[in-house]
Amino acid sequence: MNVLVTVASKQGATEEIGQVLAGILRDAGLSVTTSAPEAVSGLDTFDAVVLGSAVYAGRWVGSASAFADRFAADLARREVWLFSSGPIGDPPLPTEEPPAASALVERLGAREHRSFAGRLDRDRIGLMERAVTRALKVPEGDFRDWEAIRAWGDEIAADLVGPTKVVRMFGTIRAAGATAPQGGTT
């Protein structure tokens, strides 16, 4: 099964989430391609798509929204998972889903949408964004919950390869029957 993981990220934090998800899917024995949304020319070779975007002011990055618009008909015929990254703080705020997420789930027939907390590193953003985040007292830091992200990746893998075919081994998932490294067990 061929899976596309495509992520729109402004500062790299959301892209890192996509890379972790792609790695989990590969470890489950799936063929995974990663690409920026604007670089994808077609979906003919993919059976499933994981589409993610950073969220700024409650909105997805333009290239992710454009991807969803451009390939809406193709996405509606595939297994699709959506995720957003952007709420920050402890607890992450805002707590509500990005406004367009539920509409996208419905329009694309996506299996699910998940929101994950993000990261704010003021050294990586522009002067205007820095001023706004300071004025709004937005906390700086990395608030991503890697355990929750990996668990969701495991769920996607199980959906694609079958729940009885995926087992956790040494912190990664492998297709059942895969050989364990020397000294390991499945």
Task: Give, region by region, the residue ranges found by the protein language model.
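Conserved beta-strand termini and adjacent loop/short-helix elements that scaffold enzyme active sites
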Residues: 6, 35-37, 83, 116
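A short beta-strand-loop structural module common to alpha/beta enzyme folds
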Residues: 28-40
